[in-house]
A protein has these predicted regions:
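Single conserved hydrophobic/aromatic residue that forms the stacking wall/gate
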Residues: 186, 190-196
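A short, charged helix-loop
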Residues: 181-185
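Thiamine diphosphate
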Residues: 1-168, 174-175, 180
Length: 196
């Protein structure tokens, strides 16, 4: 067990999931250089550019590709720079990822994790600082997760990655540097620590 920050806990959970399951992939802007806030640092070097995928700046295309990957058997993790940009991909999130299971009688599951950083942060403009968790919670078919502590961020990200449903995973930007309790990895059985 180790004391780590909120951001480090999520990075550890994602790295462990990628080591355990080759179907877990990550895609988004600038992930190869570690992500906008450093939360993907070192992952492309470890897993390669075909599993940590740098994308063009087109949120609708990123999300559409991730929905297709999920339907084809992968477990994509989509990184949006901020939650506000997810609104550029709202059709893919609301009408495709969230509804697929219902449209195809449970046969079209979309095991997708959308990491959407929320909240105000130093030098962020108004269109980079929203908290839309309540809005997403009103969309049938989406699971909304907002971890509060480093242990939450570790356990809930692993549980989200194991879920068969699309998960809107909202980390508050102001929490990334917060150190927390020791991360209890030994208590996690298989890939799930806390069900979502």
């Amino acid at each position: 067990m180790a004391v780590m920050t909120y951001a480090q806990a999520a990075a550890l959970a994602l790295a462990e999931a990628m080591r355990a399951d080759p179907a877990v992939v990550a895609l988004g802007e600038d992930l190869g250089r570690g992500g906008v806030f450093g939360q993907y640092r070192g992952l492309q070097q470890e897993f390669g550019a075909d599993r940590v995928i740098d994308t063009p700046i087109s949120e609708a295309n990123i999300m559409g590709a991730a929905v297709g990957m999920a339907l084809a058997g992968l477990r994509p993790v989509v990184e949006m720079r901020v939650v506000d940009f997810a609104l550029c991909a709202i059709d893919e999130i609301v009408n495709q990822a969230a509804k697929n299971r219902f449209m195809f009688g449970g046969q079209g599951r979309v095991p997708l994790v959308m990491r959407l950083p929320i909240g105000i942060w130093s030098a962020s403009a108004a269109q980079h600082s929203q908290s839309l968790e309540a809005w997403f919670a009103h969309i049938p078919g989406l699971v909304v997760v907002t971890p509060a502590t480093p242990q939450d961020n570790y356990s809930l990200l692993k549980a989200s990655l194991a879920s068969g449903d699309p998960v809107v995973y909202m980390e508050h930007k102001e929490l990334w540097g917060v150190e927390g309790e020791e991360i209890g990895r030994a208590s996690c059985r298989e890939r799930v620590c806390v069900p979502v």
